[in-house]
């Protein structure tokens, strides 16, 4: 039977929410990426990694660098959770190219999910980065603003929660397919 494990690194909690949801749907173990060892990873057929996006970096993506020699022989699924959405104007490929080792890039399945943010809980530098992003959104031409951009502009002071578990369906299907293929052998 295919063994699946989900590693994650969460800062504001949205990535952990997705990790809990995905692991419950796949009936797989969920672990903090910090505790991962090569020996442990080698016990699984499919590795899912999730991390929050901050300043174009997927937190904990060093997990992929540190374990790439073991991950090369596995099915690897990576999901990134951030407050902005990717569309035809902003490609998520550049985010993943910056954060996934070149040796793994073409073999990994990648997904983006919308997260949450509570500005009251941000540290000084995080607030600075968020306000910079907010200014960029506000300065976009109106026809380029996405519905998410408008939500961020309107509600950023109160906190924003855009977590949407239905957006996980494609990732779940991807992981289930590998489980079925291995079970058929």
Which role fits each region the language model picked out?
Residues 46, 56-185:
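FMN-binding flavodoxin-like domain, especially the glycine-rich phosphate-binding loop
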Residues 1-72, 173-185:
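N-terminal beta1-alpha1-beta2 submodule of the flavodoxin-like/Rossmannoid cofactor-binding fold
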């Amino acid at each position: 039977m295919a063994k699946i494990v989900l590693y994650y690194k969460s800062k504001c909690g949205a990535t952990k929410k997705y990790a809990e949801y995905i692991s419950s749907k796949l009936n797989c173990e969920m672990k903090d990426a910090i505790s991962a060892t090569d020996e442990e990873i080698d016990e699984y057929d499919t590795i899912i990694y999730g991390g929050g996006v901050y300043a174009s970096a997927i937190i904990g993506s060093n997990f992929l660098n540190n374990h790439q020699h073991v991950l090369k022989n596995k099915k690897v699924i990576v999901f990134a959770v951030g407050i902005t959405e990717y569309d035809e104007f902003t490609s998520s490929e550049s985010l993943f190219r910056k954060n996934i080792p070149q040796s793994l890039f073409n073999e990994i399945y990648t997904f983006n999910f919308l997260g949450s943010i509570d500005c009251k809980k941000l540290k000084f530098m995080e607030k600075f980065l968020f306000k910079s992003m907010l200014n960029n959104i506000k300065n976009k031409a109106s026809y380029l603003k996405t519905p998410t951009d408008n939500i961020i502009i309107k509600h950023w002071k109160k906190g924003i929660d855009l977590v949407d578990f239905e957006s996980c369906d494609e990732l779940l299907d991807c992981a289930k397919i590998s489980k079925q293929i291995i079970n058929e052998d």
